[in-house]
Curated annotation (Swiss-Prot):
Coiled coil region boundaries: none
Subcellular location as annotated: Cytoplasm
Catalyzed chemical reaction(s): an N-acyl-L-alpha-aminoacyl-tRNA + H2O = an N-acyl-L-amino acid + a tRNA + H(+)
Binding site for tRNA: 14, 64, 66, 112
UniProt keyword annotations, A-Z: Cytoplasm, Hydrolase, RNA-binding, tRNA-binding
Protein name (record): Peptidyl-tRNA hydrolase
GO biological process assignments: protein quality control for misfolded or incompletely synthesized proteins; rescue of stalled ribosome
Membership in a protein family: Belongs to the PTH family.
Encoding gene, per UniProt annotation: pth
Organism: Rhodospirillum centenum (strain ATCC 51521 / SW)
Region named Disordered: 182-227
Assembly with partners or alone: Monomer.
GO cellular component: cytoplasm
Basic and acidic residues: bias regions: 198-215
Residues of the site described as Discriminates between blocked and unblocked aminoacyl-tRNA: 9
């Protein structure tokens, strides 16, 4: 069995906050793969189901972020799950918005949810780090993570969550490297169009007659670009 934990804070007022992107990922997993109903257990909400034939327990701790490890530790002890079978979706300040990294073990990087998990679970669990970007100064971090995603951020957030969930079979099958590669491929921003090739000598001569002058003009700004 795999234990898949989403980190976040319980309550509707926190639903769209950056700190709750782990909850968002687990909620989408629950819907897409037809998990059973949410039940209150282990100081949180749990749901049982399977992904690609692998039995999975979803967990959203109801302890608030700083005590997330208490809920995960209880579930692990009950089901005799080892740390390497635990997958944690969480927000990551040190990654640009929309970037994802998957790693096993490591430090908490100041993330209080991970700090609590380290205390109750150990450090040898898998982390799916979902980049939310950094506000620029330490003083602004709390306000940043506890603020809602802006409307403009939905352009990368929704496709990213879709990709995280669509490729989940790779993750639960124990292929995190392939999972991370697929996420990067599916969420790669479109490349800007290449500049037009310079016209050949013959085209230069006819351009002066007004027949191809228009096609020789450089294109305007690419649609959708914000600079």
């Amino acid at each position: 069995m795999r234990l898949v934990v989403g980190l976040g804070n319980p309550g509707p007022e926190y639903e769209r906050q950056r700190h709750n992107v782990g909850f968002m990922a687990v909620d989408l997993l629950h819907r897409r793969y037809g998990f059973g109903p949410w039940k209150r257990r282990f100081q949180g909400l749990t749901a049982e189901g399977s992904v690609a034939g692998e039995k999975v327990l979803l967990l959203k701790p109801a302890t608030f972020m700083n005590l997330s490890g208490q809920a995960a530790g209880e579930a692990m002890r009950f089901y005799k799950i080892t740390p390497d079978q635990v997958l944690v979706f969480h927000d990551e300040l040190d990654l640009p918005p929309g970037r994802v990294r998957v790693k096993r073990g490591g430090g908490h990087g100041g993330h209080n949810g991970l700090r609590s998990l380290d205390d109750h679970v150990g450090k040898d669990y898998w982390r799916i780090r979902i980049g939310i970007g950094h506000p620029g100064s330490k003083e602004r971090v709390t306000g940043w993570v506890l603020s809602n995603f802006a409307k403009a951020e939905e352009q990368w957030l929704e496709p990213l969550l879709d990709a995280l969930v669509a490729e989940a079979p790779l993750l639960v099958a124990g292929e995190p490297e392939k999972y991370a590669s697929r996420i990067a491929l599916l969420t790669q921003p479109p490349k800007p169009p290449k500049p037009p090739k310079p016209p050949k000598d013959g085209a230069k001569e006819t351009a002066g007659k007004g027949t191809e002058a228009e096609t020789a003009k450089p294109p305007g700004p690419a649609a959708g670009r914000t600079g």
